[in-house]
Amino acid sequence: MTLPAARTGVLARKVGMTRIFAADGRHVPVTVLSLDGCQVVGVRSEEERSVTTKKGGQVTRTDGYKAVIMGSGDKKAKNTTKALRGQFAKAGVAPKAKLKEFRVSGDLPEVGSTVQADHFAEGQLVDVSAMSIGKGFAGAMKRWNFSGLRASHGVSISHRAHGSTGMNQDPGRVFKNKKMAGHLGDERVTTQNLVVVRTDVERGLILVKGSVPGHDGTFVEVRDAVKKALPADAPAAGSFKAPEKLSAGGEG
């Protein structure tokens, strides 16, 4: 059995939630994701290449794997480090606010090209990853959905307490990862198998059914679903727009 080539994911900005109406009149809750000028900033390849050292010598190196570095969002050049400015200039793209590397196994796109919204086919399933909304210190009922204790019949003060956490004299300790009160949110979360309801190539929008992690305005990673096969009408190698070289004053 030959597995299909792993395609690159994309970086998108979460705009917010709304709803659209299907052909039969049903309303579908969707999250709007904006590609926000998502471009290929660099690539990693298994091919050997010649690199010039600081002393002027030549050495042969390889990355050892295939990957695509995607960048999204605008960022002022004065707020970008000198090292990153050099990478963006080499790629011929404006400074990006967010970078992410995606492992691939197929053909590598051209550096500087822009990904289009039809990189994903309508009806296919995708996985969306992002940092969840931080909610600070939370109790066991909010954090782990505990039912809590009774409202009366001898219960006093401990209505929302998580109850006993220890065991007997053996082992005589609280196990690690015990569900207790603590910090909630602000962690990497992946929502799997979300349906792509609609794409808008002109405006660079992807509409997925349901909610995705993170607050409005955060960057999310969108990939082909790892647990579901791609549909037959999915783009073979993604849809990319040819790169446009920056002018001399394009980095301001």
UniProtKB/Swiss-Prot annotation:
<dbReference type="Pfam" id="PF00297">
    <property type="entry name" value="Ribosomal_L3"/>
</dbReference>
<keyword id="KW-0687">Ribonucleoprotein</keyword>
<keyword id="KW-0699">rRNA-binding</keyword>
<dbReference type="GO" id="GO:0003735">
    <property type="term" value="F:structural constituent of ribosome"/>
</dbReference>
<feature type="modified residue" description="N5-methylglutamine">
    <location>
        <position position="169"/>
    </location>
</feature>
<dbReference type="InterPro" id="IPR000597">
    <property type="entry name" value="Ribosomal_uL3"/>
</dbReference>
<dbReference type="InterPro" id="IPR009000">
    <property type="entry name" value="Transl_B-barrel_sf"/>
</dbReference>
<protein>
    <recommendedName>
        <fullName>Large ribosomal subunit protein uL3</fullName>
    </recommendedName>
</protein>
<dbReference type="GO" id="GO:0022625">
    <property type="term" value="C:cytosolic large ribosomal subunit"/>
</dbReference>
<comment type="function">
    <text>One of the primary rRNA binding proteins, it binds directly near the 3'-end of the 23S rRNA, where it nucleates assembly of the 50S subunit.</text>
</comment>
<keyword id="KW-0689">Ribosomal protein</keyword>
<dbReference type="InterPro" id="IPR019927">
    <property type="entry name" value="Ribosomal_uL3_bac/org-type"/>
</dbReference>
<keyword id="KW-0694">RNA-binding</keyword>
<dbReference type="InterPro" id="IPR019926">
    <property type="entry name" value="Ribosomal_uL3_CS"/>
</dbReference>
<dbReference type="GO" id="GO:0006412">
    <property type="term" value="P:translation"/>
</dbReference>
<comment type="similarity">
    <text>Belongs to the universal ribosomal protein uL3 family.</text>
</comment>
<keyword id="KW-0488">Methylation</keyword>
<comment type="subunit">
    <text>Part of the 50S ribosomal subunit. Forms a cluster with proteins L14 and L19.</text>
</comment>
<dbReference type="GO" id="GO:0019843">
    <property type="term" value="F:rRNA binding"/>
</dbReference>
